[in-house]
A protein has these predicted regions:
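Non-globular, low-confidence helical/coil segments that flank catalytic cores
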Residues: 1-307
Length: 307
């Protein structure tokens, strides 16, 4: 009985140890926030939070589980776009952590959650938080071989592309027209993030749909990926066959709520990733998903908290 008790104690301590210190491996945590997105990228003392999920406390609970409790600073928060299931939980993040910099797309939306978000931005900016609006594809070198690039289809420019097909030429010319950009779905205004850590590549697609995917493809910004956070929760409006065939991720992660009213993820989308033998990981089935990388390989971390 003593041995069994000792084993249980060791297992518990092992599972909660990350809360007491900083890991040397890159951590990518896809938080289970229900129907929404919140992704934490963590390397040493650096944290990047992409979106904060809907207006509930699930993102904060996820951060409390994975960010060492001695660290109350998040270096960078990226709000991919203004939908409530992506920005709704950020007010709680601002209230519980010191955020050094916020990056967002600068587009407004007439909702209560966006009003709360914009008020929080002003409050935190007055307290010293830097705020940046993405105006072009830009790269940030985080250090320790970790580089992130913002990809923003709304501000793509035809001059960035070379040797494009007629289809791409027409598409890129269309989206550079002001009226066409206005007509684009707000989902296609999502900031996508391309992250490279040594040999490992990660693409976080926000809610980008097929128009945004085609833009990234035409600009030559898509390549085989190690990890893809599937766009728009696995909706059939995203993850075209062209996109999936170009990225062919080893891991396809779908952030989605249980029994959601939208029917996400689409079986058609799931079958496309299956076709390319991607390991499909879903938050509605697995809860929060933690992937670790040493820069050469990726593996899934499991704990006693896993479903």
């Amino acid at each position: 009985m003593y041995k069994i008790g000792l084993i249980i104690v060791i297992c518990i301590l092992w599972s909660i140890w990350p809360q007491f210190g900083f890991r040397k491996d890159l951590q990518i945590i896809f938080c289970d926030v229900g129907q929404g997105d919140a992704t934490l990228v963590q390397l040493g003392t650096f944290q990047l939070l992409v979106d904060g999920g809907p207006p509930n406390e699930k993102a904060i609970e996820c951060l409390g589980r994975y960010v060492p409790f001695v660290d109350r600073t998040i270096e960078l928060v990226v709000a991919t776009h203004q939908d409530s299931d992506h920005i709704g939980g950020l007010n709680s993040v601002f209230a519980n952590y010191h955020v050094r910099e916020l990056v967002w797309n600068g587009e407004e939306k007439q909702t209560a959650d966006f009003l709360t978000f914009s008020q929080a931005i002003q409050r935190e900016q007055d307290s010293g938080m830097r705020v940046s609006i993405v105006a072009h594809a830009s790269e940030i070198n985080i250090g320790s071989n970790l580089v992130a690039t913002y990809l923003f289809p709304r501000v793509a420019r035809f001059s960035n592309a070379t040797q494009v097909s007629h289809k791409c030429e027409t598409h890129l010319q269309d989206i550079t027209d002001t009226n066409s950009m206005t007509d684009m779905s707000s989902n296609d205004g999502s900031i996508a993030l391309f992250i490279r850590y040594k040999q490992v590549t990660i693409l976080l697609m926000g809610d980008q749909e097929t128009t945004g995917e085609l833009t990234l493809s035409c600009l030559g910004l898509l390549e085989p990926m190690t990890i893809v956070k599937v766009g728009h929760h696995g909706s059939k409006s995203s993850s075209s066959m062209e996109f999936v065939s170009q990225t062919q991720p080893e891991y396809a992660v779908i952030s989605v709520g249980k029994n959601n009213r939208f029917g996400h993820p689409s079986p058609e989308v799931v079958s496309r990733y299956d076709l390319f033998r991607s390991v499909i990981l879903r938050t509605d089935l697995l809860g929060s998903i933690e992937l670790l990388s040493d820069g050469d390989r990726v593996w899934r971390e499991k704990s006693l908290f896993d479903i």
